[in-house]
Amino acid sequence: MVTIVLGSQWGDEGKGKITDYLSQDATLCCRAAGGHNAGHTIVHDSVTYDFHILPSGLVSPKCINLIGAGTVVHIPSFFKELGALAEKGLVDADKRIFISDRAHVCFDLHSVVDGLEEAKLGGRKVGTTGKGIGPCYSDKAARRGVRVGEILDEEVFERKLRNLHSGYRNRFGELAYDVEEEINRFKEYRQKLKPYIIDQLPFLQKYKNDDRILVEGANALLLDLDHGTYPYVTSSSTGLGGAIQGLSINPTKIKNIIGVVKAYTTRVGSGPFPTEQLNEFGEKLQVTGREFGVTTGRKRRCGWFDLVLCRYSLAVNHYTALNLTKLDILDDFDEIKVAVAYKLPDGTRLESSYPADAGVIEKLEVEYVTLPGWKSNTMGLTKYEDLPENARKYVEYIEKGLDGVPIKWIGTGPAREHLIIR
């Protein structure tokens, strides 16, 4: 059976921690989509690990890991990340990681183009990570991309990369990029990569009767290309559909769909954010929550918990259980607000649907309920009954507001053991 972990808001919810926890019993951990624009931080045995393209299951010594067909892989980052894990003691990580030959290659060329495209947008920029993810997925959709498996065929690889470069030069003129230099780098990568590249389908068939398969979502539902706050989204399918598509999962084998929700809301980059607090509350959340992007280092925008957004996320992703993270960050608030409805400019009231038009979202009014804070330390608590009464009421209010989907896990700190299991 398969357990899928998905982000329910705009990313940075803390998916890595619950994935790390669940991977202790997993046989296989897979990334289905996205690239090295994602960022997860895991604290285990007082060691902090940062993950971008690699699955978090590598921290578990018995877990095999797969970067699936729906991903885009920046090869230098892949090896850099593996090296960083080895330096921190995960010396066998390189023996437990594989890449689908159908995944696409994200080149330095894509990063250069990403910057040029953002610059052209000016004030309407998306606020990408600048890692080249969008241009890489664009090349994939236009059927001119380079797949990981094609790296092994030197002639095909070099021809396709030169064609990509030529196409972008025709569009942008001279680029701050040397295609021959990149080709030479891949001469070294070619042999190094060979042990990692596999045909995904027969690889996964070996696990078809295994009940301990874990899928680690990247980014989050509101960044999904189809269901997110378009155009302020990433370029892949970040929801349930993307997990199934990117890994050829049998839907009847899915046992758990875990939605990870932060106890407040954050967003990196541009785009609408109805509950954003551009005041002392937002600043307090940012500072107390240490809200800086793992990938970019940018400050995250912060705001109150949004039930409307999460109800919409639930309707798209069909969560069977929830993981509420970073509850301890709210410890010092006198009052805590929760968004329960939106009021559109025409007077329409929304409780569980999310407007498709980013311009409409920017203009809506938010209806809040105000709940009392608990003003006591919850960091490191591991028993639900030990939470202050108002903290329990906050958890149960969110649970009730999300159709009673159980909040099975509650994060009370950064470490693996800082977790309440209900």
Swiss-Prot record:
Binds 1 Mg(2+) ion per subunit. The keyword Amino-acid biosynthesis does not apply. GTP binds at residues 11-17, 39-41, 300, 326-328, 411-413. It catalyses: IMP + L-aspartate + GTP = N(6)-(1,2-dicarboxyethyl)-AMP + GDP + phosphate + 2 H(+). Pfam families: Adenylsucc_synt. It is an enzyme of class 6 (ligase). Its main location: cytoplasm. SMART domains: Adenylsucc_synt. Its EC number is 6.3.4.4. It is found in: Cytoplasm. Pathway: Purine metabolism; AMP biosynthesis via de novo pathway; AMP from IMP: step 1/2. Keywords: Cytoplasm, GTP-binding, Ligase, Magnesium, Metal-binding, Nucleotide-binding, Purine biosynthesis. One of its GO terms (cellular component) is cytoplasm. IMP binds at residues 12-15, 37-40, 129, 143, 219, 234, 298. Belongs to the adenylosuccinate synthetase family. HAMAP family: Adenylosucc_synth (MF_00011). Plays an important role in the de novo pathway and in the salvage pathway of purine nucleotide biosynthesis. Catalyzes the first committed step in the biosynthesis of AMP from IMP. Homodimer. This is Adenylosuccinate synthetase. It comes from Talaromyces marneffei (strain ATCC 18224 / CBS 334.59 / QM 7333).
